[in-house]
Amino acid sequence: MQAIDGNKDVNKIYGWIEVGGNGSTSNKTNASKGIAANAPAAYDVYSNTIQLDQAALYFERIENTAQKDHFDWGYRLTLLYGTDYRFTTSHGLLSQQLLVKNAQYGFDPVMFYYDAYLPKLGRGGSVLRVGRYISLPDIEAQLAPNNYTYSHSILYTYDCYTQFGANLTTKVNDHWTIQEGISPGCDTMPWTTDARVTGNVCVTFTWTNGANALNTCDNTINNGKYAYNNLTAFYETYYHRFNATWHTDTEFWYQYMKDVPNMYWYNSGGLYAKSATTPFPETNGAGVNLNFGAVCEDPRAPAAQQSARCYAPEWAITNYVEHNFWHNTASLNIRNEIVDDIKGQRTGTPAIYEEHMVGFDFWSGSTITFRPELSYTKCYSKYTTPDGKPVSCTDISAGSSIASDESQVLGNGAIPTGRGKTESLTLAADLIWHF
């Protein structure tokens, strides 16, 4: 891939256009209304469609960290348009496209930051980054060419995407790298009522000449109380290179929020009203079917046994096995994962999810990437309908499974489409043109 200016200057302009499509056993999608039936999968979230996932444009200058003589600086501005804006959106920054309109397509300035290289701080120097940047941990990445596959793991879909603040990365020596920073929280801008002063600390230990790396990260250090995506999250990621063509990555996280509203509390109208203590969503109502709370107790329990709020945790583990072949012009991608959304706060349904994916990357020159894949998702819901069927946790609009839970478990509402559906099979592919 060549930048627009032919890489002749330290300031680069480049980008890509990514178009994707899929065929899925989940068939309740209405893309024009933002109903994404492939959830909890991402980014191929709209089933049985062809879509513009990303049209991305980069403006950047990369600081020179190969020298120790002098200060240097860099910057990046990334402009993104497409369906994938719904994953990168930060509350308070053009977020009405998603949180009010639930639009299929949207625009997001996903990165805008300044880097300052400090060569004398640490044996390997330090970089201070200020602005909006990609959240530090994770195997996967939001921007299409930076990811192994077209789709993303469920683990990645429901954790932190971006932060706005400052981070210092220091290479202590050839083995240890330390990162620390401060922000208003995950996917939240500082001028919103959801903003919380939030710290983060990550440590990476690398050994055997880079063949092994262990990253430990506390990504959100604050009070952990309910707010927009205010996830207290602990990460452990391990990378191992077997040889020149095979490697594996494994990631585990445990997340939680405290004092999360109970979707089934009898006085939900007052609890869910937008206020300083419950600032999200931007649009709200008095019903119990809002999709931002948790299933704190069994929905079939009487009102007297339902708590107003609860502790809502979840854990997940994902593994990738990667093999490069054809002189690094193609790769085999294998992903396996388990996610336990204990209180349903992330996906909308208290359930254990397993997902398995096999895919390929094929490069045609330096301009075209083609990534086909086949994935299977199975969920094990923790509740059943009055006639004993499992509550739906696939083929339902992202986050709205709570509404289906109420209708099915309590038996007092219209039967939702997709009732009892607990698995999905998806054949998907994307094509990326780099410029």
Task: Mark where each language-model region is.
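A short, flexible beta-alpha/helix-coil linker loop
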Residues: 184-187, 222, 255
